[in-house]
A protein has these predicted regions:
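Cross-family detector of peptidyl-prolyl cis-trans isomerase
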Residues: 1-143
Length: 143
């Protein structure tokens, strides 16, 4: 496949992803328990506890499952039973915003639109352009 054909194919999937993502987010915001922030981030509380909340300068230990709208799993630390350690300020914008809402021990689902994730470019071969990302996150600890 030539570079031009690849570029045109990518543009097609980008447009398809944008439409599918927009349709998904419009329907998802109507579901019971889903909250939409002014930024466009949508989230649902799966399990809430009364712990402390992290701040943007913290490092966190989290369990996470990230998947695309088509169900393709990008990462699943629950299955691997190996939580991730990350710096909050290094996360994509939508993930960071959602994580700062959480309390230690809680579990949330984030529905992150492309403009709060990797946008038009995507991320390498794992995340296509204009992809909505669905994260299932448990905040284990932070410091």
């Amino acid at each position: 496949m030539s570079k031009r054909e690849k570029r045109n194919k990518s543009r097609g999937s980008s447009g398809h992803n944008r439409k599918a993502g927009s349709d998904f987010m419009a329907k998802n915001r109507l579901k019971e328990g889903v909250v939409e922030a002014p930024s466009g981030l949508q989230y649902a509380v799966v399990e809430e506890v009364s712990g402390d909340q992290p701040e943007s300068h913290h490092n966190v230990i989290i369990h996470q499952r990230c998947q695309l709208l088509n169900g393709k799993v990008i990462i699943d630390t629950y299955r691997e039973n190996e939580p991730s350690e990350v710096a909050v300020d290094e996360l994509i914008e939508g993930y960071r915003e959602g994580l700062l809402l959480m309390r230690k021990g809680s579990r949330y689902k984030f529905f992150i639109p492309p403009e709060l994730a990797w946008g038009k470019k995507g991320s390498r071969s794992k995340i296509p352009p204009n992809a909505v990302l669905i994260f299932d996150v448990r905040l284990i600890d932070f410091w």
